[in-house]
Amino acid sequence: MATYAIGDIQGCYDSLQRLLERCAFDPASDRLWLVGDLVNRGPKSLATLRLIKSLGPAALTVLGNHDLYLLMVAEGGAKFRGKDDTLQEILDAPDCAELLDWLRHQPICHTEGEYCLVHAGLLPQWTASRARELAREVEITLQGPDFREFILNLWGSEPAGWSDNLSGWARLRVIVNAMTRMRFCTLDGVMEFKVKGKLSNAPAGHIPWFDLPDRKSAKSVLVTGHWSALGLKVTPNLLALDSGCLWGGHLTAVRLEDRQVFQVDCSPTEALPLKR
């Protein structure tokens, strides 16, 4: 049995199919770990969502910011932001309700052995096990009767830092933003959300979350996506797998058992023009 961790798909269904062939993925014996952002901007978000759902226990995904955005739009908590959004086909699908119910029952953080699977990253105050506890707070709300109220209160970037004293929607918003949106932080873990580019674009006083000194999750292996400008980054304690398929780059998988990397080029019909 092999476990393949795969970067952000974002509706690039054709590239995903070619990557699974490249890996010789067998759903009867292998597993997929998906870093989230299954949908949006690529041309086949509906097909992607249906495929991952159909794999059952052979596929484990955490939620990314685009997945949560889909849930927000469906509940009226957000409006489409631009012409690059490709979620309408999901909302119009006959199985939309079933797909969205499945999506909101996925975790936002998964820990297993030395690994921690999360879309964006973890704040420096959190061990992987603590992050899993905090993620569960979000998941209970996301899957429970307060789901719609939660979605309507999720949007926003404040508070930008963690405190154990946080409560209510503010507490859940910080957890979600760290795990699904974070890239750069100050040394004390205050998040910055405006800059999305390369490491050289770091705002003054900010560094990548994974370079924060004394980060409590440093002994775990973090498996992440979200940061296409960072590209594939493989270190002993970090597998950053968003290699920019949507932007004409690659879709990447790493086999966890031996760290072998598998990649396919983005299908020409799926790539968006790079934003400079």
Swiss-Prot record:
GO terms for molecular function: bis(5'-nucleosyl)-tetraphosphatase (symmetrical) activity. Keywords: Hydrolase. HAMAP family: ApaH (MF_00199). Its EC number is 3.6.1.41. Signal peptide: none annotated. Gene3D superfamilies: 3.60.21.10. Belongs to the Ap4A hydrolase family. CDD domains: MPP_ApaH. Pfam families: Metallophos. It comes from Dechloromonas aromatica (strain RCB). The gene is apaH. The lineage of its organism: Bacteria, Pseudomonadati, Pseudomonadota, Betaproteobacteria, Rhodocyclales. This is Bis(5'-nucleosyl)-tetraphosphatase, symmetrical. Hydrolyzes diadenosine 5',5'''-P1,P4-tetraphosphate to yield ADP. It catalyses: P(1),P(4)-bis(5'-adenosyl) tetraphosphate + H2O = 2 ADP + 2 H(+). It comes from the Bacteria. PANTHER family: CYTOCHROME C5, PTHR40942.
